[in-house]
Amino acid sequence: MLYFRYGFLVVWCAAGVSAAYGADAPAILDDKALLQVQRSVSDKWAESDWKVENDAPRVVDGDFLLAHPKMLEHSLRDALNGNQADLIASLADLYAKLPDYDAVLYGRARALLAKLAGRPAEAVARYRELHGENAADERILLDLAAAEFDDFRLKSAERHFAEAAKLDLPAPVLENVGRFRKKTEGLTGWRFSGGISPAVNRNANNAAPQYCRQNGGRQICSVSRAERAAGLNYEIEAEKLTPLADNHYLLFRSNIGGTSYYFSKKSAYDDGFGRAYLGWQYKNARQTAGILPFYQVQLSGSDGFDAKTKRVNNRRLPPYMLAHGVGVQLSHTYRPNPGWQFSVALEHYRQRYREQDRAEYNNGRQDGFYVSSAKRLGESATVFGGWQFVRFVPKRETVGGAVNNAAYRRNGVYAGWAQEWRQLGGLNSRVSASYARRNYKGIAAFSTEAQRNREWNVSLALSHDKLSYKGIVPALNYRFGRTESNVPYAKRRNSEVFVSADWRF
């Protein structure tokens, strides 16, 4: 019901621009516009013979509004401008009962209700129907373009915004159209991001802790030692989303990252990894799905794979290719609301190593299954977590008459928390931890049983908004990793502290 006192109809909505004319603008209460609405409705009251008695609140029910169709239509238009879903729903149902109601106004109400209720596909369908029947209506054109943008139909949204930009519209409306077109260009243009940071690694050569074993009645101990090295971590990513039709896109994405110890004269310990995708992606307001074939490379700081006596070049910047492979990724992400998302992905690829001995054991296929979720808590915190399963199946099931012990299955879980500390002036923190079990097949080397690993990893990152400069955001990072195993040579322990500088352009 609507309540009336002192000759003014109190409509609980913000009178302002519509979804299309003011989309993406903050919701504000325009007191001047609201006063004009109230005065306009008050004039309608003055024309009626309904008198005020004892200054009591007057209740306006559906029958009264049906008896005053102009007042009902005026209120519905104001509710549309204010994006008030409950009020629109009540007034639209009443308005449709009028014998000579405006079908276009009613259609706009149903379309906006679908949009506000989180049904963007339905909203687009309704606006497209309205636009097909009323191609000259500027308001419907803008509402349609905004709805298509919200549902990530960027190609048609850009086309309709381009049409609107040619119309004789008020300057604020044209400015808003320009903002939408700029956003669309940013989403479909080339996007680059990357980072470079100094790092100190206490175990750059990935050596196992010192251990001893019995061999023919003699004790043999390892001689390798962990080597400390200062290096540079680097990462760069490029992405291009090309609209095809409606929610369908061609996606190109590539990334490469690694560590170089060039300045420590230990380039032999360099490592890197790169992957490039090119495939189909479906994307709308609620979900994203993709089929993405990819090519990947694994990089190394040394090319002396088979020639063990070859002298190592410890002052080399470009890495060598250690292994490469091709595969495909199937992925799906669902967002039930803006603050919560679920993701699942499947991967399959085949890898090939350059080194003959390693290729004999490690050429083969790898399958992965990944499930993750992220939840926004309030305005400044996000928690996330997931489960990962990976298996490696070597091309050669047996080597030298024994089961290939490079085959494994890995189960892992991880969780994390990201927080923006506004009370500290813009400090941002991110902490994550993971645990996994990796079980190998066959008998491990120098052992009588299969290898069983347990892997722990912890990472922490701190950054501050006030320290950013032209899109470059420095962060202090700490990483710790530990692997426990039933075979001594597979044990690992490593920690790293580094300052990163990430940027997007």
From Swiss-Prot:
Residues 1-19 form the signal peptide. It is a multi-pass membrane protein. It comes from the Bacteria. Keywords: Cell outer membrane, Membrane, Signal, Transmembrane, Transmembrane beta strand. The chain crosses the membrane at residues 190-200, 232-243, 248-258, 273-283, 287-297, 326-335, 340-350, 368-377, 381-391, 411-420, 427-437, 456-465, 472-482, 495-505. It holds the Pfam family SlipAM. Its main location: membrane. Residues 189-505 are annotated as: C-terminal probable beta barrel. The keyword Transmembrane applies. GO terms for cellular component: cell outer membrane. It is found in: Cell outer membrane. SUPFAM superfamilies: Porins. Required for correct export to the cell surface of cell outer membrane lipoprotein HpuA heterologously in E.coli (hpuA does not exist in N.meningitidis strain MC58). Belongs to the Slam family. Consists of a soluble N-terminal domain and C-terminal probable beta-barrel in the outer membrane with 14 predicted beta-strands. This is Surface lipoprotein assembly modifier 2.
